[in-house]
Amino acid sequence: MGWPEEYGGQGKSAIEQFIFYDETMRVGSPAPMLTINTVGPTIMEYGTDEQKDSFLPEIAAGKLHFCIGYSEPDAGTDLASLATKAVRDGDEYVINGQKTWTSLALGCDYIWLAARTNPDVPKHKGISLFAIPIDTPGIT
């Protein structure tokens, strides 16, 4: 509801969107909160045109769902302590690490994964987010 119309939303205010979510939760209706409230707006703000064109229409239509890939066995949700690394290899990144307590993993299409991309800066910096298909080889 609160997404801009150009991205498939209704252009409603934040208050109207919160009321909608409150009512959705009150009646127990499923809603992809992470995808709608975190992933979509982040892509709107920071994504490339290609990412916007690929992800946002599918999210707005309720056809694409993300799980969250932040927590790690030795760090919990302390993102500054991330050990998972993403190293550029040509036009791609190779990601190595371990995630745990992956919220919303059942039935998701992508992992919204945080990984360290720059180990040479303070630990609360040098972290990037990746949209990784859940069926990527190596994900178990």
Placement of each model-derived feature along the sequence:
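Active-site-adjacent elements of ketosynthase-type condensing enzymes
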Residues: 74-82
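Short, solvent-exposed loop/turn elements at beta->coil junctions and helix N-caps
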Residues: 6-8, 71-75, 100-101
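A short core secondary-structure module
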Residues: 92, 96-140
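Short, ligand-facing micro-motifs at secondary-structure edges
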Residues: 28-29, 79, 139-140
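A structural signal for short hydrophobic beta-strand segments in well-ordered beta-sheet cores
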Residues: 84-87
